[in-house]
Design a protein with these regions (language model features):
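Residue-level recognition of strand-loop junctions within catalytic nucleotide-signaling folds
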Residues: 32, 72-75, 92, 116-117
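Catalytic-core segments of nucleotide cyclases and related cyclic-nucleotide turnover enzymes
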Residues: 81-84, 114-150
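Signal-transduction coiled-coil helices of two-component systems
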Residues: 6, 91-94, 136
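Conserved long alpha-helical elements within nucleotide-processing catalytic cores of c-di-GMP signaling
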Residues: 1-19, 25-52, 61-65, 69-70, ...
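Catalytic core regions of nucleotide second-messenger enzymes
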Residues: 62, 91-109
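A structural signal for short, well-ordered beta-strand segments
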Residues: 22, 68, 109-113
């Protein structure tokens, strides 16, 4: 996969890969209030904004329900925090205008950020990012949290 290739290249170059795990805050409420078609539009708009605020070599994938996972090759933890904050601010500033209605939907993101140096550590880095994501949610949502080991 492209992710494995990216991780292997960074491992050979001994460069870190940042892992951003994010969740759309209160997404169930969007679906419950506006319906799943609007929820799908929110997911698509969020992915587009995230991609627009990432570099050409960065990878973005939907990780499940309303979660996204981004791999940022050759990115230090501090640069990853800056990237996540930039994405968070861009999504927060965006208003989705639902086609054929006057409905406007705004969402925010919570992030967990970790770093990985080799392919073998990817699952552990994902678990650390997930813990940091939950810390973001526990501390009020709409924020970026760096995993403790970083």
């Amino acid at each position: 996969s492209q992710a494995q290739h990216t991780l292997a290249a960074c491992e050979r170059a001994q460069e870190p890969v940042a892992l951003l795990l994010c969740d759309i805050d209160h997404f169930k409420q969007v679906n419950d209030t506006h319906g799943h078609a609007v929820g799908d539009q929110v997911l698509q708009a969020t992915a587009k904004i995230m991609t627009q605020n990432m570099r050409a070599g960065d990878l973005l994938a939907r990780w499940g329900g309303e979660e996204f996972l981004a791999l940022l090759p050759s990115t230090s933890p501090s640069a990853a925090l800056e990237a996540a904050e930039r994405i968070r601010e861009a999504v927060e500033a965006f208003t989705l205008r639902v086609s054929d209605t006057n409905t406007q939907v705004r969402v925010t993101l919570s992030f967990g950020v970790s770093s990985v140096r080799c392919l073998d550590d990817l699952l552990a880095a994902t678990a650390r990012a997930d813990q940091a994501l939950y810390a973001s949610k526990d501390n009020g949502r709409n924020r970026v949290t760096l995993a403790e080991d970083q």
